Amino acid sequence: MAAKDVQFGNEVRQKMVNGVNILANAVRVTLGPKGRNVVVDRAFGGPHITKDGVTVAKEIELKDKFENMGAQMVKEVASKTNDVAGDGTTTATVLAQSIVAEGMKYVTAGMNPTDLKRGIDKAVAALVEELKNIAKPCDTSKEIAQVGSISANSDEQVGAIIAEAMEKVGKEGVITVEDGKSLENELDVVEGMQFDRGYLSPYFINDAEKQIAGLDNPFVLLFDKKISNIRDLLPVLEQVAKASRPLLIIAEDVEGEALATLVVNNIRGILKTVAVKAPGFGDRRKAMLQDIAILTGGVVISEEVGLSLEKATLDDLGQAKRIEIGKENTTVIDGFGDAAQIEARVAEIRQQIETATSDYDKEKLQERVAKLAGGVAVIKVGAATEVEMKEKKDRVEDALHATRAAVEEGVVAGGGVALLRARAALENLHTGNADQDAGVQIVLRAVESPLRQIVANAGGEPSVVVNKVLEGKGNYGYNAGSGEYGDMIGMGVLDPAKVTRSALQHAASIAGLMLTTDCMIAEIPEEKPAVPDMGGMGGMGGMM
């Protein structure tokens, strides 16, 4: 076991804060409509230009172990916010940096870090409640487009195309983002469905950048039991291999020898296959397998109806134009199923919704209708160069996540205004403990930081703008894009309430952990001895 470097107290906390500041300062320049670009060097290919906070954060590793720990903890803030809300990563990073900076002053002055953290937690809980109260539902296409535009760095075209996609496939429908072939963004709606099961082994991945397994023109084998013996599968695998097409296997589970053989065949390029577990449980699993069968024009191979895996033929398999399998989701695009059968299946499920008694059953049945009838909307991002394409795709994906979050929990005034207005909930919050009250004050000041950073990136004077916004009420704020003051929602500057809430909660959570840290342990790298020089080669012995 390698030796460890163990450090305590203010000195190591300061190193951790240095790491926080290095990462946060790189991320914060991207915030707001006039946020700047960050250029990231890549080992292969051209540099990556981005305005996406989490992309910048993921690229940062620091040489000093203790500084790096601080940076990695803030990276977790951005990453968690991105996972939950899909956007707000830069706001979360700016909030975390502010809470840590303010909190460290109090810790250094001798206040109890645990009480400070309790005060921060109480303040955040009050702010979250207030954000819920001031959030407005986001229902119309216009509001959805506005949210999308803001998240895509004020690109109105992106907002409009996302609103159109949601209109076509419904708010529950599946929307994916792909590279386009032209200079313009395009929207393509294809019949398809998505379910929440991913590949059973990462060795099935064939697109390392997206971390997915993509199958073009595949067969689909649907089986309602476990597959562990490869001999059961061999007859159908041989038929698929002769057809020179990939295969997706959807079964209760694929394990042991069967999974190992599929992985080896895939790696060697003998037969491109991917195995996923069937979605749902019990009777719902059977129903969803049947949905996929109807969509792809195949049948569910089940002993209950007298079909066995060994006797399966290509006629029993479903087919699709393309299937994408990620870590957690599988998307079937353009199944070869009969349109009349799909419509009949949807009508049948809708009848079940009418007779269902529990809300849970109704919700699950509605999900199935959305998957069968809604289809998949594909946004094809257009750009002149590959570097621009990557940057635009980052923004479109951010905007898509933001609009979903807005539909879920409603919208609040954007541009950092909602957090300032939610401060009202803290003004009368007294904990009865001086150190906890100091924790509340830390959050009270930190909620100004996103607006301050937006103004700074736009070349304005943060203190002047914050004071003027605080003089106003409701949605009154500063639109950094146009340089005007006014009703933020009226000007179309909106943020999803879920994004603002997640950013605040995750920032406070990690910052609180940092403030209560008193010891850090890092591995001491072993010094490797220098390789000795090679001795000189002997002479050739006077050979002629």
Swiss-Prot record:
It is found in: Cytoplasm. It is an enzyme of class 5 (isomerase). GO terms for molecular function: ATP binding; ATP-dependent protein folding chaperone; isomerase activity; unfolded protein binding. GO terms for biological process: protein refolding. It catalyses: ATP + H2O + a folded polypeptide = ADP + phosphate + an unfolded polypeptide. Its EC number is 5.6.1.7. Keywords: ATP-binding, Chaperone, Cytoplasm, Isomerase, Nucleotide-binding. PROSITE patterns: CHAPERONINS_CPN60. This is Chaperonin GroEL. It comes from Neisseria gonorrhoeae (strain ATCC 700825 / FA 1090). The lineage of its organism: Bacteria, Pseudomonadati, Pseudomonadota, Betaproteobacteria, Neisseriales. The gene is groEL.
